[in-house]
Regions:
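Active-site histidine-anchored catalytic micro-motif
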Residues: 1-104
Length: 104
């Protein structure tokens, strides 16, 4: 079995969803393999990976709205607010999603 590791960083403009398909595909292409799996992992505690519809931008809008209602910022019941009003909601959203994906 052949295995390789490649790491890339991805800058953001703050809270939101970001398309990283091209970056992941470039890593796979550089590996030069015809078949296998890619494991994608994010190292930040308030960041997650979601495999999601990207053809219609309204799908992202709905996802954002759902999480905003499910885990609102500035909720009076959050105790962990030292790093700002969005920090605890970000951690909860990550716990409800995933920090890694394995893609064939």
């Amino acid at each position: 079995m052949i295995a390789g590791t490649e790491r890339f960083t991805f800058g953001t403009r703050g809270k939101g969803t970001y398309e990283i398909t091209q970056e992941v595909q470039a890593c796979v292409d550089r590996a030069g393999l015809e078949q296998g799996t890619a494991t994608i992992f994010v190292r930040h505690t308030s960041c997650s990976l979601v495999l999601f519809e990207n053809a219609d931008p309204s799908a992202r809008t709905d996802l954002h709205g759902y999480f905003d209602r499910l885990v609102p910022e500035d909720a009076p019941y959050f105790v962990h607010t030292y790093e700002g009003p969005d920090d605890m909601p970000s951690h909860i959203r990550m716990a409800l999603t995933r920090s890694s994906e394995v893609i064939p």
